[in-house]
């Protein structure tokens, strides 16, 4: 599905933008998931808000949370494990949603890809953290995220912390480079043996 993306700070959002964002978040995270919790929080003030539009209608959304934001600090303060520490010092992506009628067309992957790109542009090569609902683990793994915490309940829904790091990509790239060099070397050896064989037959 083709769509347009808009990335704004909280101060750049118009009242209409904010209305549609909060309406969508309430529709998905409160009504659809039957989860009574306070969706609006102070974290929104420090976030980048990424919206997917089709024909000027909001159809998907996520927010990019800055490193050392209020949310990250609060989570780290509540826990002594390494998972909270990682999320507290890295950017994270949250409130990822697609409106029900637009699901199944790859839009979630597009939004996450855009969010990751913006994280890299703004925060460099820092790992990117997410708090994922466990039924979406495979989806996030397909984007390169790996779990780094035990399962836990958040507002009555099972979650797991996941992180996207550049290390594995760099390692995989180095492995591919090494494999290519070995293959080229073997091809060179075979070519030399072939030439040597031809010379032997000619003699």
Residue ranges and their predicted role:
Residues 98, 104-117:
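Conserved acetyl-CoA-binding loop-helix of GNAT-fold acetyltransferases
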Residues 153-186:
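C-terminal "cap" of GNAT-fold acetyltransferases
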Residues 51, 57-67, 72-82, 92-97:
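Conserved beta-strand in the GNAT
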């Amino acid at each position: 599905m083709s769509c347009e993306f808009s990335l704004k700070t909280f101060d750049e959002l118009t009242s209409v933008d904010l209305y549609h964002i909060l309406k969508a978040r309430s529709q998905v995270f409160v009504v659809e998931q039957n989860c009574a919790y306070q969706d609006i929080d102070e974290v929104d003030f420090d976030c980048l808000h990424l919206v997917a539009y089709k024909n000027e209608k909001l159809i998907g959304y996520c927010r990019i949370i800055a490193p050392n934001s209020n949310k990250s600090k609060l989570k780290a303060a509540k826990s002594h494990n390494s998972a909270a520490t990682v999320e507290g010092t890295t950017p994270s992506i949250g409130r990822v949603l697609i409106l029900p009628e637009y699901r199944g067309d790859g839009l979630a992957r597009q939004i996450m890809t855009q969010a990751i790109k913006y994280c890299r542009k703004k925060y460099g090569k820092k790992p990117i953290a997410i708090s994922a609902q466990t039924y979406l683990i495979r989806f996030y793994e397909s984007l390169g995220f790996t779990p780094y915490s035990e399962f836990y309940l958040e507002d009555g829904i099972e979650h797991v912390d996941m992180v996207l790091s550049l290390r594995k990509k760099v390692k995989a790239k180095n492995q591919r480079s090494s494999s290519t060099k070995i293959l080229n070397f073997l091809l060179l050896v075979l070519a030399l043996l072939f030439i040597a064989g031809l010379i032997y037959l000619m003699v």
